[in-house]
From Swiss-Prot:
One of its GO terms (cellular component) is cytosol. InterPro entries: Ald_DH/histidinol_DH, Histidinol_DH_CS, Histidinol_DH_monofunct, Hstdl_DH. This is Histidinol dehydrogenase. It comes from Prochlorococcus marinus subsp. pastoris (strain CCMP1986 / NIES-2087 / MED4). Catalyzes the sequential NAD-dependent oxidations of L-histidinol to L-histidinaldehyde and then to L-histidine. Zn(2+) binds at residues 257, 260, 359, 418.
Length: 428
């Protein structure tokens, strides 16, 4: 982790961090994933089983988790944890219900009408990271908006551990969220199964959910066969702070991101020299006894940054350039600072709003754009699992009144048959 007090050097470092997923192995990874996808496309379940054994160490037979096992997982979950899952479920559901887009109709002066109609996709596939990890919150954040959208069938894939078991809490979250089918598979082969369909797994219309570089590459390659939510990179947090912020709290928030992944990025932009040093010291003090010490060290060492800025305006300028996935504003007046923020996936205001609040139960989705993509995209939501159609209806009068303009525009583009398709309707 570097401490930098030059705006220009800080900008250079932020750009380096933003490009941290760029790798010389991309061609090799693409080739591996392409081969896996092709095998799944042509050999279905046999290929899925083959690669699950190769990469995860077990044959997924049966591949699907039974409805009974899902219910049992919920029943066996600790009562306190069940309550927490239910609280999160209700808050996330309430927020996403407000996201449902409205269809509308505009009636023209001469009897014509145009409509926008929103409809859910029929089938959705959710990818939930697994193996040694367990992320029930990711189940909630993907399944709830799909359910709110009105998706008829939600299929979830998640890799099992070395014994082929999916974490009980992950299964409990799937049961609570109304996931219809759960399969004990992961990796690029699972993405291929969802995209192309197999005898056991129905082809889906949209795939959502985060994964490693192989999963992300698979999502990129199957886009066009099916829809995807986004191409998520490693997680990141940027904190804008002034001297009123608590240095220990900032250090904890930075490490809450670093513990995710060696490629996770934790950044502090502060107006205080003293605070910069205090946070630096506190970060390494906490790391010494951290249960994920090695991951934190790699993340902080390679992708951590503390930049000292002349004022909050400079902090905001650097933040907007970086476009962070998570942005915390811990200043004397966070709402005033917020007014100048242009690019961020999710924004957390004040010292009582650590990023973990958004990860678990605030309500907004925690699947957010990374690596600068917040400049042009936002979070996963209900619309991820919906599509819209335009419905257009003209009558004789409205077409006749507009015919001259349509014909003029068609002729300007050299499209004779377009123009003639209007003319012919008024010929005797």
């Amino acid at each position: 982790m570097k401490i930098i007090n030059s705006k220009q050097k800080a900008l250079q470092e932020l750009r380096r961090i933003s490009q941290r997923t760029t790798s010389g192995d991309n061609k090799k990874i693409n080739s591996i994933v392409e081969n896996i996808l092709q095998e799944v496309k042509f050999h279905g379940d046999i290929a899925v089983e083959k690669y699950t054994k190769k990469f995860d160490g077990f044959y997924p037979k049966p591949m699907q988790v039974s409805t009974r096992d899902l219910k049992t997982a919920w029943e066996e979950t600790d009562q306190h944890l069940k309550k927490s899952l239910e609280v999160a479920y209700q808050r996330i559901k309430k927020f996403h219900e407000k996201e449902i887009p409205e269809s509308f109709t505009i009636k023209g002066e001469f009897g014509d009408s145009v409509q926008r109609r929103w409809m859910p996709v029929k089938n959705a596939g959710l990818y939930i990271p697994g193996g040694r990890a367990a992320y029930p919150s990711t189940v909630l954040m993907n399944a709830i908006p799909a359910k709110v959208a009105g998706v008829k069938e939600i299929s979830m894939v998640s890799p099992g551990n070395e014994k082929g078991k999916i974490n009980t809490t992950v299964l409990a979250a799937a049961y609570l969220s109304g996931v219809d089918k759960v399969f004990r598979i992961g990796g690029a082969q699972a993405i291929g199964a969802l995209a192309f369909g197999t005898k056991q797994i129905n082809k889906v219309d949209v795939i959502s959910g985060p994964g490693n570089i192989y999963v992300t590459t698979a999502k990129k390659l199957i886009y066009g066969f099916t829809g995807i939510d986004s191409l998520a990179g490693p997680s990141e947090i940027l904190i804008i702070a002034d001297r009123t912020a608590n240095s220990s709290q900032i250090a904890s928030d930075l490490l809450a991101q670093a513990e995710h992944d060696p490629l996770a990025s934790s950044i502090l932009l502060t107006t205080s020299n003293d605070q910069a040093q205090e946070v630096f010291d506190e970060v390494f003090k906490i790391i010494e006894n951290h249960p994920r010490k090695e991951i934190c060290i790699q993340s902080i060492k390679n992708w951590g940054l503390i930049a000292i800025c002349e004022n909050l305006e400079s902090c905001v300028e650097l933040s907007n350039e970086f476009a962070p996935e998570h942005l915390e504003i811990i200043t004397i007046d966070p709402k005033t600072t917020l007014k100048s923020i242009e690019n961020a996936g999710a924004i957390f205001l004040g010292k009582w709003t650590p990023e973990a609040v958004g990860d678990y139960l605030a309500g907004p989705n925690h699947t957010l754009p990374t690596c600068g993509n917040a400049r042009f995209s936002g979070s996963l939501g209900v619309e991820t699992f919906m599509k819209n159609s335009s419905i257009i209806e003209f009558n004789e009068k409205s077409l006749k009144i507009n015919s001259v303009d349509i014909i003029n525009l068609a002729n300007s583009e050299g499209l004779h048959s377009h123009a003639n398709s209007v003319k012919i309707r008024f010929e005797d």
